[in-house]
């Protein structure tokens, strides 16, 4: 009797344990699944918010990184402009200082010396080119060939060729003379060029209009080549005024 009661009670306990395990297992599974989904959401949310924040912050970063580049570019442009202005001002001041070292009388003296150098070099170069041309023509017997082609006397052809060689040397002479003069007077070259520019500006400003030129009223030294001193420049100005007076009186 007792054994049957004990066995029945044990069976009931076993059944209870089975029922409890079968009924509780789905609940535990559901709770574990919910916990996993919550944990996954918690894991994914920070990453999504961080990406959104990064995407939102990226334009500001781009703009902030672009602003220093624009500032650097503008500063470089301003620096270049200031450097160019300073260089122009320094060149103008240096040119004025160089021009101040040379007065007008010294400028006219240097101008006359340059003209003498160019004239002497033209004479020398024309003589050299003539001698060389005669030697080349006589050795190559080109005068006979020219006489056959043009039908002229060989002496005439030789004379024309010699004159052409001398003309070439005369034209080349001023370039050589200017080069030699620049080497001799290189200490005054910059100041001389500044004074020369100023002188020709004055000539262009005060010279007369050559459209009304005539035999009775010729243009007085249109390019100012005869001016050799300050007194000569003043006389040139007087001649220009006299020409204008004659022109106005003739028109009236």
Curated annotation (Swiss-Prot):
Source taxonomy: Eukaryota, Fungi, Dikarya, Ascomycota, Pezizomycotina
Entry's transmembrane regions: 117-137, 155-175
Record's keyword terms, sorted: Membrane, Mitochondrion, Mitochondrion inner membrane, Protein transport, Transit peptide, Translocation, Transmembrane, Transmembrane helix, Transport
Main location: mitochondrion
Protein name: Presequence translocated-associated motor subunit pam17, mitochondrial
Record keyword Transmembrane present: yes
Keyword Nucleotide-binding belongs to the record: no
Family assignment from sequence similarity: Belongs to the PAM17 family.
Gene Ontology BP terms: protein import into mitochondrial matrix
Entry function: Component of the PAM complex, a complex required for the translocation of transit peptide-containing proteins from the inner membrane into the mitochondrial matrix in an ATP-dependent manner.
Membrane topology: Multi-pass membrane protein
Any one GO CC term of the record: PAM complex, Tim23 associated import motor
Subunit organization: Component of the PAM complex, at least composed of mtHsp70, MGE1/mgeA, tim44, PAM16/pamP, PAM17/pamQ and PAM18/pamR.
Transit peptide: 1-87
InterPro entries xrefs: Pam17
Source organism of the structure: Emericella nidulans (strain FGSC A4 / ATCC 38163 / CBS 112.46 / NRRL 194 / M139)
Pfam families reported for this sequence: Pam17
Cellular localization per UniProt: Mitochondrion inner membrane
């Amino acid at each position: 009797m007792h054994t049957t009661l004990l066995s029945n009670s044990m069976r009931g306990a076993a059944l209870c344990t089975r029922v409890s395990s079968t009924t509780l297992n789905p609940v535990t599974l559901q709770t574990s699944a919910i916990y996993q989904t919550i944990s996954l959401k918690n894991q994914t949310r920070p990453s999504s918010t961080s990406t959104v924040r990064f995407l939102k912050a990226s334009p500001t970063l781009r703009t902030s990184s672009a602003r220093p580049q624009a500032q650097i570019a503008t500063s470089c442009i301003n620096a270049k402009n200031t450097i160019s202005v300073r260089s122009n001002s320094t060149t103008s001041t240096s040119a004025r200082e160089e021009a101040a070292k040379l007065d007008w009388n010294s400028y006219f003296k240097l101008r006359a010396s340059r003209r003498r150098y160019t004239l002497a070099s033209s004479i020398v170069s024309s003589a050299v080119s003539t001698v060389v041309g005669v030697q080349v023509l006589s050795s190559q017997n080109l005068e006979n060939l020219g006489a056959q082609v043009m039908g002229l006397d060989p002496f005439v052809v030789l004379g024309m060729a010699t004159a052409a060689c001398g003309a070439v040397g005369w034209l080349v002479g001023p370039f050589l003379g200017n080069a030699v003069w620049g080497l001799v007077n290189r200490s005054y070259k910059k100041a001389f060029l500044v004074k020369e520019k100023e002188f020709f500006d004055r000539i262009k400003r005060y010279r007369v209009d050559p459209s009304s030129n005539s035999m009775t009223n010729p243009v007085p030294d249109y390019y100012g080549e005869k001016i050799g001193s300050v007194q000569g420049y003043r006389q040139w100005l007087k001649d220009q005024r006299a020409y204008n007076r004659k022109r106005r009186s003739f028109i009236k």
